[in-house]
Regions:
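Donor/substrate-binding cores of folate-linked one-carbon enzymes
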Residues: 23, 88-203
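Short, surface-exposed acidic-centric catalytic microdomains
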Residues: 28-72
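N-terminal glycine-rich "phosphate-gripper" loop used for MgATP/nucleotide binding
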Residues: 37-38, 61-62, 66, 80-96
Length: 212
């Protein structure tokens, strides 16, 4: 069986990338084929290079506009024959053309229980609204902001003292687990879109990896 090849897009330190490398890379037929960033100084690129993974930088300033940059990124990913594009702390919206090109093959992890608190600073939004429970969502990416079909979610209780640091630490821990779990399910062909409702995906929970 063929290897399931994933590309990871990053902007920051790469803790979610590191979790993918530790939990999935080279296991069960899953391979991190390449890592790309919109930030040349991203620590995540160092993590990828340390693991012997090909990297590239696609800055918006190096292209005429976002669409041109995303077209170049898409060509680079297509040349590497990736099966899935994973947004792991990639802090920029993808252009509609890129999303259409990789339709249902892009996943993102978001630190809230969508559709609540989309966009930036989801933890701050949750604290400002006084919620007692927030969480983590892994979803397919569409043309909107954190609006794609939900693959997996997990709740996280907000500390009674409203401490942001403790909440962020727990959310990061859950992000690492949930994103890896979602990738494993997608690689096992256990996630499928609903032909009658584009908002819904169906997930088989008990599966074995079908690649490798």
């Amino acid at each position: 069986m063929s290897t399931f090849r994933i590309a990871v897009l990053v902007s920051g330190t790469g803790t979610n990338l590191q979790a993918i490398l530790d939990r999935l890379h080279g296991q069960g037929g899953i391979e991190v084929a390449c890592v790309a960033s919109n930030k040349p100084g991203a620590r995540a690129l160092e993590r990828a290079r340390d693991a012997g993974i090909e990297t590239a930088v696609f800055e918006r300033a190096a292209h005429s506009d976002r669409q041109a940059r995303d077209a170049a990124l898409g060509d680079w990913l297509a040349e590497r024959e990736v099966d899935l594009v994973v947004l792991a702390g990639y802090m920029e919206l993808l252009s509609p053309g890129f999303v259409q090109r990789f339709r249902d093959r892009i996943v993102n992890v978001h630190p809230a229980l969508l559709p609540s608190f989309p966009g930036l600073d989801a933890v701050g939004q949750a604290l400002a609204h006084g919620v007692r429970v927030t969480g983590v969502t892994v979803h397919l990416v569409d043309e909107g902001v954190d609006s794609g079909p939900i693959v997996l979610q997990r709740a996280v209780e907000v500390p009674l003292d409203r401490g942001r640091a403790a909440l962020e630490q727990e959310i990061h821990r859950v992000e690492h687990e949930l994103l890896s779990e979602a990738i494993r399910l997608i690689a096992a062909e256990a996630v499928r879109t609903d032909p009658e409702n584009a908002r819904i995906v169906h997930v088989e929970s008990q599966v074995e990896t079908r690649h490798g």
